[in-house]
Curated annotation (Swiss-Prot):
Domain of life: Bacteria
Binding annotation for NADP(+): 194-199
Catalytic activity entry: (S)-4-amino-5-oxopentanoate + tRNA(Glu) + NADP(+) = L-glutamyl-tRNA(Glu) + NADPH + H(+)
Lineage per the UniProt record: Bacteria, Pseudomonadati, Pseudomonadota, Betaproteobacteria, Burkholderiales
NCBIfam families from the UniProt entry: hemA
Recorded name of the encoding gene: hemA
Further details from the record: During catalysis, the active site Cys acts as a nucleophile attacking the alpha-carbonyl group of tRNA-bound glutamate with the formation of a thioester intermediate between enzyme and glutamate, and the concomitant release of tRNA(Glu). The thioester intermediate is finally reduced by direct hydride transfer from NADPH, to form the product GSA.
Name recorded for this polypeptide: Glutamyl-tRNA reductase
């Protein structure tokens, strides 16, 4: 079995492409079934394994397969599933085999490959991806072991380095950008659209600035109300957004919608109602919640996750010593995992040896049982059984020794000596 990771992320693709390749949560299980059965082959010698990690910043397919054409098949499947041409998608895709796939998984879970260096959210997202793949019946020995090692490495990196210390989160970056637009956030009305983890983080950071008003708009009213109460804010129905957008100076959106929920026309009307007072908008969703054309309006300052990345990277630069330490830990653990993977490569051979030996055993036992049933001497039957098993079991090694020459033969002789040096001795040889 070969490990392979196929994906795109914020390093290789803009948000405009990432949002088209993202998987809504409810689509991941059926997508995994299709991916396994159609492109990795349901009747392969070993059942293929797969997991999908889809976040704001990355979409990745983790695979374990015997199919040597899995790389091309996975890229083709990804493009066909999302109705994007291979020519458009392929330049942005990375394909990481074996140790590169292992190293990548370790780095992602440890926060080294995140836009926010050392952030912890990705670890939870990866665990969710593993849980979903397990429920879909898509995981097996190889990916299970990879992800369990991945989580252990992430824990080690975060526990022994300062990789997450003083990190500038996306939420903190949003506040910093708002402070560049407005003299003070405390005079502004802030609207958050959504009620997930990212909105909760953003609300925490903005609430610390004591804004004039803090409002949560969410599709599920009860959840929005609970979050608003935590920050002494108010909740409003998401359906009120088109008629009330003009009330807010700062709008931060991050929902799981597959289509934009804020269009150009609605924002144009809001700007007009505000008499062209500026609106600061942050779209942290992938796919995007706000139509990108909104950013072209004169009095609107629209930022996406990619725009916030520059501010985040400023904070990342100061923690390079921790990065180096983390990379050292990861490299050691990659080598450990590859050693385990190497041992797995002999499992099919060992299984075949057991199957062959057991077939020989059953055949000879059946023959012996017939002789005993016929009334033959039990001692003679046992002797014949043992002789037959001995001859058949050493036939393969003996033939191999006779076929090879030179250095190969010397190596094989040494190997055979090692096989049989601990063979048990008979009673007459043991001196008892």
């Amino acid at each position: 079995m070969q490990l392979l990771t196929i994906g795109i992320n914020h390093h290789t693709a803009p948000v405009a492409l990432r949002e088209r390749v993202a998987f809504p949560l409810e689509q991941i299980k059926p997508a995994l079934v299709t991916f396994k059965n159609v492109f990795l082959g349901p009747h392969a010698p070993n059942a293929p394994e797969a997991a999908i990690l889809s976040t704001c910043n990355r979409t990745e397919l983790y695979c374990a397969t015997d199919d040597r054409a899995a790389r091309e098949g996975a890229i083709r499947w990804l493009s066909e599933y999302h109705r994007i041409s291979v020519d458009e998608l392929a330049p942005h895709v990375y394909a990481l085999p074996q140790s590169e796939a292992v190293r990548h998984a370790f780095r992602v879970a440890s926060g080294l490959d995140s836009m926010v260096l050392g952030e912890t959210q990705i670890l939870g997202q990866m665990k969710d991806a593993v849980r979903t793949a397990t429920e879909a019946g898509a995981l097996g020995t190889y990916l299970n072991q990879l992800f369990q090692r991945t989580f252990a490495v992430a824990k080690e990196v975060r526990g022994t380095t300062e990789i997450g210390a003083q990190s500038v989160s996306m939420a903190a970056a949003a506040v910093r950008l708002a402070q560049r637009i407005f003299e003070t956030v405390s005079d502004q009305r802030v609207l958050f659209i959504g009620a997930g983890e990212m909105i909760e983080l953003c609300a925490t950071h903005f609430a610390a600035q004591s804004p004039r008003e803090l409002v949560i708009a969410n599709r599920t009213a009860e959840r929005g109300q609970r979050l608003a109460e935590r920050f002494n804010g108010r909740a409003m129905p998401l359906s009120d957004l088109p008629t009330r957008m003009h009330e807010f100076d700062i709008i931060v959106s991050c929902t799981a919608s597959t289509l934009p929920i804020i269009g150009l026309g609605a924002v144009e009307r809001a700007v007009k109602a505000r008499r062209h007072r500026p609106i600061f908008m942050v779209d942290l969703a992938v796919p995007r919640d706000i139509e990108p054309e909104v950013g072209k309006l004169k009095d609107v300052f629209l930022y996406t996750v990619d725009d916030l990345g520059a501010i985040v990277r400023e904070g990342n630069a100061s923690r390079q010593a921790a990065v180096a330490q983390a990379e050292t830990i990861i490299e050691t653990r990659v080598q450990n995992f590859m050693q385990w993977l190497d041992t797995r490569s002999v499992v099919p051979v060992i299984r075949h040896m057991h199957t062959q030996a057991d077939a020989l055993r059953r055949a000879e036992v059946e023959k012996a049982q017939k002789l005993l049933a016929r009334g033959d001497d039990p001692a003679a039957v046992l002797e014949a059984l043992s002789q037959a098993l001995t001859n058949k079991l050493i036939h393969g090694p003996t033939s191999a020794l006779n076929r090879v020459n030179g250095a190969d033969r010397d190596s094989l002789i040494d190997l055979m000596r090692g096989f049989y040096q601990h063979a048990p001795r008979s009673n007459d040889q043991s001196g008892h």
